[in-house]
């Protein structure tokens, strides 16, 4: 699970561990990884099944090394292979009219380029080793809206990439889907210290919870989701789906 130290990725890790999986979470900060693993390992049932890996989603040149490191880690825990990739890492930013080229590249490199090449690597690994598995891409309901930021452009890209990967990998027993959260109560979206999940701009009147997104992720990569292929599952509370024509949104 890339970007697993906080927010949706952290709660996905918790949900996967609760379901019995061995989990590798990645992040750029060794300290944040240590804190996240410390919190998750407070549950004794998860110990021995959780591994951390320092990885920058923009450093495509290091992906082979980092993936081999992940294989070594799970192998030391008795797992013969990795069969699920969750492309979750992402950053916001680079909106018109004030976006800089540097900010634009950071968003696209993290949210789209990194996902493309990590999926290329992982898909090749599954095919070469005849492992049936899953790729789950974390998109955004913003991919339903007109794009005026690098973030939204990147999520449009994730939507298309999910379809392409699903079609090309399905014959090899690899299931690819996307999950597209709407406004979610995570540190990336909520203001510092905000603990009120009320969101009057959302048809259900509140933000989605990362736990809700994580529970759906478990379904999509489990046998329960085997016939769901190439889909983006929108978990928005209605934002961008029943209000898709509303340009006055805050994420």
Predicted regions and their residues:
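Short, small/polar-rich loop/turn modules that mediate ligand/substrate recognition or access, typified
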Residues: 170, 175, 228-230
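Conserved NAD(P)H cofactor-binding loop of Rossmann-fold oxidoreductase domains
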Residues: 88-93, 238
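Substrate-binding pocket helix/loop in short-chain dehydrogenase/reductase
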Residues: 95-108, 198
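Short C-terminal tail/terminal secondary-structure segment
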Residues: 218, 229-251
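Residue(s) in the substrate-gating loop at a strand-loop-helix junction
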Residues: 140
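Active-site helix of classical SDR
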Residues: 119, 154, 162
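Conserved glycine-rich cofactor-binding loop
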Residues: 5-6
């Amino acid at each position: 699970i890339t970007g697993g130290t906080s927010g949706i990725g952290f709660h996905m890790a918790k949900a996967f561990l609760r379901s019995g999986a061995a989990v590798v979470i990645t992040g750029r900060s060794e300290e944040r990884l240590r804190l996240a693993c410390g919190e998750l390992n407070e549950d004794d049932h998860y110990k021995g099944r959780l591994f951390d890996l320092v990885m920058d989603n923009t450093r495509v040149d290091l992906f082979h090394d980092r993936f081999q490191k992940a294989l070594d880690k799970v192998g030391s825990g008795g797992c013969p292979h990795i069969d699920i990739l969750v492309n979750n890492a992402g950053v916001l930013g680079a909106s018109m009219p004030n976006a800089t080229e540097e900010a634009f590249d950071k968003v696209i490199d993290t949210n789209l380029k990194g996902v493309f090449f990590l999926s290329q690597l992982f898909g090749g690994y599954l095919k070469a080793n005849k492992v049936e598995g899953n790729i789950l891409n974390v998109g955004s309901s913003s991919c339903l809206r007109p794009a005026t930021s690098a973030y939204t452009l990147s999520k449009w890209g994730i939507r298309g990439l999910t379809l392409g990967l699903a079609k090309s990998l399905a014959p090899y027993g690899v299931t690819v889907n996307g999950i597209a959260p709407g406004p979610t109560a995570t540190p990336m979206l909520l203001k510092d210290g905000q603990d009120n999940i009320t969101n009057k701009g959302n048809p259900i009147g509140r933000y989605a919870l990362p736990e809700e997104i994580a529970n759906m992720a478990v379904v999509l990569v489990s046998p329960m989701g085997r016939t769901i292929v190439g889909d983006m599952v929108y978990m928005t509370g209605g934002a961008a789906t029943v209000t898709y024509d509303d340009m006055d949104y805050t994420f």
